[in-house]
Amino acid sequence: EVGRCTVVARPDSKAPLLADVSLEVDSATHNSEAQSWHVNLFSPHLPNVGQATLIRRLMTHVAQDPPSGLMHYPTRAGGHPARAAAAQWLGTAPLGSFGADDVVLANGGQNAILMIFQTLLCGRRPAVLVEELAYLGFRRAAELLRADVIPVAMDAHGVIPEALEAAAKSHAAQIFCTSPEVHNPTLAFTPQPRREALAAVARRCDLHILEDDCYRLGAAQAPGYRMIAPERSWYISSISKSITPALRLGIAVAPEGQAAALRRTSEYSFFGLATPLTDLAAALLVHPELPGIMDAARLRIGTYVQRAVNILGAFDLIWRADVPFLWLHLPEGWRAGAFVQAAEGQGVRIRAAEEYACRDARAPHAVRFAINAGLSLDSFEAGLGRMRDLLDNPPDVIGV
């Protein structure tokens, strides 16, 4: 009403600043039944092929005689064996020349992303460039640091160089986040010529590159960005998709000459990883049984992938035998949101493409579903069979 004063409501002190969006990803709870009608395919769940037994054994040894003791703060010198073990574990990754002094350990891959952002982002309104569809952890980490997240257009080979250059210049961006070996969620692979073109853009625009390699279980198919552009490329991996997510062990490799800045971020944030964990990592990552265990896990994942292809292969399904998730373009008649809801009604939990897109971006009518090896093959196949029935019978809805 004209003439009345402006009324300002008192802020609700109980309301959170940001929506409480859970990032919980455990798709098979501890001691849950392998036989289940409910099939959670949100995130991969590794098969237990001996790693739990090995970890328990090594934890016992560490507890009996911890190399770092139990009464001391973490130190750089004390953490060196774990960093050296991590560098050896990454030895086959095509990252160029690096060693233990280039490695900084983190509390999982997500923490490694956040630490790199904390190290690099500056200014009143920093900007992070991500792929058009991208791992949502990039967005969550950027949001924590009040950074703008800018999606960049892609084609079948990854981000388009011209689109990256345009976005970098128009937003004064500082870092480009990418998963060139196993793109999450589409499984796309970025070949070497495209990587070199993107690295050239990064040099022209003074962009850092963050390469997330957490989902690669097999051999790399092209040089990593740290080999192509060693002065500006940060690399992260973790043991969550290959050994276990329970230990929350992430590995970051800094560009040449920049590890000190990342170590400073780590030490200023939490002093360093807990010493029992670094002692365990130092033993686990170089243990002679570990390569065989990882091979067995990869083969078991491949079995689940093949069963999924047997059931859903008649549809537009994208898969790789050594990647623990699949990407499904929905047939005519289905929208991603409606299909996810219908699948949940049949006891199957999957992710819509829009979860990987920025808020105002367009997303295809596609879904991602992960390999849950915590379920029996029978339960896994039964859940996918119910998905197939839905795909074969889209809803007959006519909008008016």
Q: Predicted segments — roles?
A:
Residues 253, 327-329, 370-372:
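Short hydrophobic/aromatic beta-strand micro-patches
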